[in-house]
């Protein structure tokens, strides 16, 4: 994976390199080495240092490798988080989206003061040098306006002057025509998934000799990773870092390798159900420790309370009704974050009631499975939920001839796999989902035999005929809608929607 460093954006004298993207989209443009003086001309002679579109391909570069592949330019421009160093070498996190005009900075008043001071000087200089260009110049801003109102404009214009980008890459040629995007990107930190190594490359701008880039390896990168750990989610497959605030919009799919990360039940409801149509069922049903399970570490009730506070859920499943592309459905979604999605008496009862409600209302049924199996703290009461749910599904499927779709996510194991997880009329699995009855560790310890790698992955099991299809999250809602319509479940017309509401 690659993590970008925007190094010392606040130091005027370090504005030494210009990065250009040529009009040809198959290569990253050259980097020009400009001179740097004690009084940097970038603030007073900006126009002299900016090349026109016709001059882009004439730039030359020395001792500088490509900074980023062309295929990553779109992502770089739209949404990126930068680790920014100020003049005192302190690091801060900045999330910046030009197109959406979003700017988020670590809340540190000293850093913000320095940033404000720099951009105030920068904007004043640009305003004075371009005051004769007319009202249409995009460098002209009211320098007396408040910091809060103009910070996005300051940074956007600062970034516009160093990288020349083809208009179509931005998707808005009119807005960004004849403008330049500044980038003072010092380097990338490349992380190898196998070795878990991190290397940072930082531009050396104080001394412009033959070695324009200094490579630094060590524990500093690990410290930075820990410092900003709350901003990122690490992919369990490639170990790439995904920014938390945009991961949800990507359906919790790793932007580096496409791996499907775990997803909360609430996010799945938002993904599958039409907005404003979700009606939860049995939200107040909670476990009361039916067998008074004894634990030397933490009492069962206390553990339940802890997970309720952490997840905001009452149990490991959410059940209810809603519309999927206008089609009324009954849906149950298990949440692995709540005690590993384990199936206790409450989980079994909620799913059974959901099946019975769908039977009475003649609704199609969806159950999204994500579970480690039966909950050991409830003993045989948790095991009997397998038979109870299966019995309700028998009436739903065979007697009422209704349609049940089972969706297996990672992980789906134990009693859930052995019961309702495998009883769907259509069984769908997510890519790379871990699906098994007994886990790999349990099998190896019990049978003293090694479990072949990948033998419990969705792709291998699909080829063995264990389920019907592997469907990524992106097209899942549309595919479910088509399946329901093939089985004579159609979207409600407006009058029916109003009468049901």
Curated annotation (Swiss-Prot):
Gene3D superfamilies: 2-enoyl-CoA Hydratase, Chain A, domain 1 (3.90.226.10). Its main location: plastid. Keywords: ATP-binding, Chloroplast, Fatty acid biosynthesis, Fatty acid metabolism, Lipid biosynthesis, Lipid metabolism, Metal-binding, Nucleotide-binding, Plastid, Transferase, Zinc, Zinc-finger. Pathway: Lipid metabolism; malonyl-CoA biosynthesis; malonyl-CoA from acetyl-CoA: step 1/1. It holds the Pfam family Carboxyl_trans. Acetyl-CoA carboxylase is a heterohexamer composed of biotin carboxyl carrier protein, biotin carboxylase and 2 subunits each of ACCase subunit alpha and ACCase plastid-coded subunit beta (accD). InterPro entries: AcCoA_carboxyl_beta, Acetyl_CoA_COase_Trfase_b_su, ClpP/crotonase-like_dom_sf, COA_CT_N. This is Acetyl-coenzyme A carboxylase carboxyl transferase subunit beta, chloroplastic. The gene is accD. GO terms for cellular component: acetyl-CoA carboxylase complex; chloroplast stroma. A zinc finger (C4-type) spans 235-257. GO terms for molecular function: acetyl-CoA carboxylase activity; ATP binding; carboxyl- or carbamoyltransferase activity; zinc ion binding. It is found in: Plastid, Chloroplast stroma. GO terms for biological process: fatty acid biosynthetic process; malonyl-CoA biosynthetic process. Disulfide bonds: none annotated. HAMAP family: AcetylCoA_CT_beta. It comes from the Eukaryota. The keyword Kinase does not apply.
